[in-house]
């Protein structure tokens, strides 16, 4: 159950000077439409995050949604949480996203409280966590900040706790990488995006989103100390991984 939005037409007209992509008011207004039409398997990932939370949430623990945007993962988890004494902490640094996220969260009644926080996820304390979600968020951090954040998450997770990490992937084999990029662009065309929109969005986002390979992610998980980790979902060059402490 994702929030409805206006259609995404941000890149539909020619832009003389394309700036870096930001999660501003314009993007927040069209975000549900944008992400459904841009990220293959997004609805499946959101649904399954709720299922994973149901398995891993412990009573009297914290659940973190870091880079929560409009709260789709938060709402999915909240629908599945039956344990007592739990709290979801949903964090985003975009004021426009946080404002709308609060509206979406408050539209549904639940026994599990949600604290929507406007903050930089790098500055958030992680403690007593049974579930932490980074849903297409880590890729927007500078590479040097990623390891530090994952270390902090690991330290704040309870034993047996889970990190759910959804990302766009790059592939070491050039032929495979290009094929999956092409298939992703086919997916966007099939969802009504024009060549101009695809090209301009790519130009806007390439400097702010720097994806890693699955190997990079697994090596980091191993170095930090996670006991089990793997890919649980992939569609083209997008997917989601779990890492268990």
UniProtKB/Swiss-Prot annotation:
Keywords for this protein: S-adenosyl-L-methionine, Transferase
Catalytic activity: prephenate + S-adenosyl-L-methionine = carboxy-S-adenosyl-L-methionine + 3-phenylpyruvate + H2O
Residues holding S-adenosyl-L-methionine: 42, 67-69, 92-93, 120-121, 135, 202
Keyword S-adenosyl-L-methionine: yes
Annotated EC: 2.1.3.-
Pfam families, A to Z: Methyltransf_25
Broad EC category: transferase
UniProt xrefs under InterPro entries: CmoA, Methyltransf_25, SAM-dependent_MTases_sf
A molecular-function term among this protein's GO annotations: carboxyl- or carbamoyltransferase activity
GO biological-process terms attached to the record: tRNA wobble uridine modification
Similarity comment: family membership: Belongs to the class I-like SAM-binding methyltransferase superfamily. Cx-SAM synthase family.
Subunit structure: Homodimer.
NCBIfam families the record matches: carboxy-S-adenosyl-L-methionine synthase CmoA, PRK15451.1
Function of the molecule: Catalyzes the conversion of S-adenosyl-L-methionine (SAM) to carboxy-S-adenosyl-L-methionine (Cx-SAM).
Listed name of the protein: Carboxy-S-adenosyl-L-methionine synthase
Taxonomic lineage of the native organism: Bacteria, Pseudomonadati, Pseudomonadota, Gammaproteobacteria, Vibrionales
Gene, per the UniProt record: cmoA
């Amino acid at each position: 159950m994702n929030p409805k939005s206006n259609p995404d037409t941000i890149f539909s007209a020619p832009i003389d000077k394309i700036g870096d992509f930001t999660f501003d008011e314009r993007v927040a207004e069209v975000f549900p439409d944008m992400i459904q039409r841009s990220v293959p398997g997004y609805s499946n990932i959101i649904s399954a995050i709720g299922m994973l939370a149901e398995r891993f949430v412990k009573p009297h623990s914290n659940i973190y949604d870091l880079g929560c945007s409009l709260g789709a993962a938060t709402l999915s988890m909240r629908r599945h949480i039956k344990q007592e004494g739990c709290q979801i902490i949903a964090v985003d640094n975009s004021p426009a996203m946080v404002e709308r996220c609060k509206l979406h969260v408050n539209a549904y009644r639940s026994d599990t409280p949600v604290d929507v926080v406007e903050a930089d996820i790098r500055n958030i304390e992680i403690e007593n966590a049974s579930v932490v979600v980074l849903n297409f968020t880590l890729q927007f951090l500078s590479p040097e900040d990623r390891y530090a954040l994952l270390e902090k998450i690991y330290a704040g997770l309870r034993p047996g706790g889970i990190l759910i990490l959804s990302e766009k992937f790059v592939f070491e084999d050039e032929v495979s990488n290009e094929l999956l990029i092409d298939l992703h662009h086919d997916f966007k065309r099939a969802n009504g995006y024009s060549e101009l929109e695809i090209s301009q969005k790519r130009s806007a986002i390439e400097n702010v989103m720097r994806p890693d390979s699955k190997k990079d992610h697994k090596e980091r998980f191993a170095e930090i100390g996670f006991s089990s980790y793997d890919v649980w979902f992939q569609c083209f060059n997008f997917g989601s991984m779990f890492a268990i402490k």
